[in-house]
């Protein structure tokens, strides 16, 4: 990059952590009813968007890290799909232990797969809808939570099965239909703060055109007093990048 080049986007790794923590918080808050068959195992299934996509990899790792089911491979949490994992012996994940109110539960990733259709398209909502049908036939009431790398796949699974069976489903992107579905039992989603990304983009451009410091109106107030709060963005000087921070959208704040 030259000295006048900057990047604006969202923090994928921070967003992945937000999604994982959102799922864990929901489980802990609803521990008295989350275990549908009472077997002491909190089972979840995971819809993976694209096994080679950075955002998909980050989100899979974020969920597994938060729930304790991740295993390391080459210094990072393994993000590969497990296929089915009925007995908890899949190499890609591990059973985790979660203690809430003095009681211990096993957390298990029952199944995960890349949602790729026959034409090769990834992040495919229809494939996710079919997958939840297969998983529900295989696992039944062992599925306590449904997690997806995005809302497109998440809503497909929610509408196909989770909603009628009252199983919390979590996605990512804060799509309007997903946010609206929270009132119907959708567990939650993650906002990438598109408004902050848009403001950052326009502000960096405006500052460049005006010949003022790039941080004007972002980290330092402009003449009109415009400035962003530190909880909605971060700046990486090494990467010359502005990142909007992600936020959980749940029944508590939607």
Residue ranges, per PLM feature:
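A residue-level marker of the well-folded mature domains of exported/periplasmic proteins
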Residues: 1-254
